[in-house]
Amino acid sequence: MRPMTHVPVLYQEALDLLAVRPGGVYVDATLGGAGHARGILERGGRVIGLDQDPEAVARAKGLHLPGLTVVQGNFRHLKRHLAALGVERVDGILADLGVSSFHLDDPSRGFSYQKEGPLDMRMGLEGPTAKEVVNRLPLEALARLLRELGEEPQAYRIARAIVAAREKAPIETTTQLAEIVRKAVGFRRAGHPARKTFQALRIYVNDELNALKEFLEQAAEVLAPRGRLVVIAFHSLEDRVVKRFLRESGLKVLTKKPLVPSEKEAAQNPRARSAKLRAAEKEAP
């Protein structure tokens, strides 16, 4: 196994808003490298950690952290996973929606446009891969996917380039796709030209926005009175879903404006730059 290098984003802010109390039961719905989970444990809480990635689950179990129960599964099935443990109510729920550093740093998972690997992008290693999507989706559907899930202004041009390329030979790797996009749109000042294309494909492959909506609805249900929900989003589509849900959920919103990383944290951890943290509390009846 590779060494643990994942850096939790907005670590202190998330734990402070979660208001961990000794003996309380908390859900880390995106366990990953267990960074946030460790913080909850250090404050005396018990943690149920969910992750759909079997590799992340194996890493977390290998830590043998007292008070941590590790469950493999998608957070969209939160209530089901808690019921299997005999848990009806929890004192807090944390979700860090960012792509794990483990995923980005492992070329074999296919998340990075900067490292060559198979076009996969599946968080849970089940279902269709990004390779299947880019090689099979019709032009119009592909353009719509890039426009709606990647907020890509040149979606149609990129989709046309992908279709033209796959007519010659299947698109197999991350760098192959990234080069197709680069040639289609050229270089950009704001990041790599393939960034939004890769975001769109990842969201589509993992059905991320629907999963997030289902998770949020269930999270509000299983929170105990005065229990808190803390969510860290990393792009505007996610943040929009979280913001709308909190506004309509009946929960007491604790963050009038989302918390964002300090300049120091953003400099130390560039992947944190786009993070936005929102939190809410379930009021006592």
UniProtKB/Swiss-Prot annotation:
Disulfide bonds, paired cysteine numbers: none
Region (Disordered): 258-285
EC numbers: 2.1.1.199
Source organism, top-level taxon: Bacteria
Keyword Cytoplasm part of the UniProt annotation: yes
Top EC class for this record: transferase
Catalytic reaction list: cytidine(1402) in 16S rRNA + S-adenosyl-L-methionine = N(4)-methylcytidine(1402) in 16S rRNA + S-adenosyl-L-homocysteine + H(+)
Keywords (A to Z) from UniProt: Cytoplasm, Methyltransferase, rRNA processing, S-adenosyl-L-methionine, Transferase
Major subcellular location class: cytoplasm
Pfam families noted in UniProt: Methyltransf_5
Record-linked Gene3D superfamilies: Putative methyltransferase TM0872, insert domain, Vaccinia Virus protein VP39
Localization, UniProt: Cytoplasm
Listed InterPro entries: RsmH, SAM-dep_MeTrfase_MraW_recog, SAM-dependent_MTases_sf
MF terms (GO), sorted A to Z: rRNA (cytosine-N4-)-methyltransferase activity
Cellular component GO terms held in the UniProt record: cytoplasm
Protein's UniProt keywords contain Ribosomal protein: no
Biological process according to GO: rRNA base methylation
NCBIfam families attached to this UniProt entry: 16S rRNA (cytosine(1402)-N(4))-methyltransferase RsmH
Function: Specifically methylates the N4 position of cytidine in position 1402 (C1402) of 16S rRNA.
Similarity annotation: Belongs to the methyltransferase superfamily. RsmH family.
Protein's recorded name: Ribosomal RNA small subunit methyltransferase H
Source species of the chain: Thermus thermophilus (strain ATCC BAA-163 / DSM 7039 / HB27)
Origin organism lineage: Bacteria, Thermotogati, Deinococcota, Deinococci, Thermales
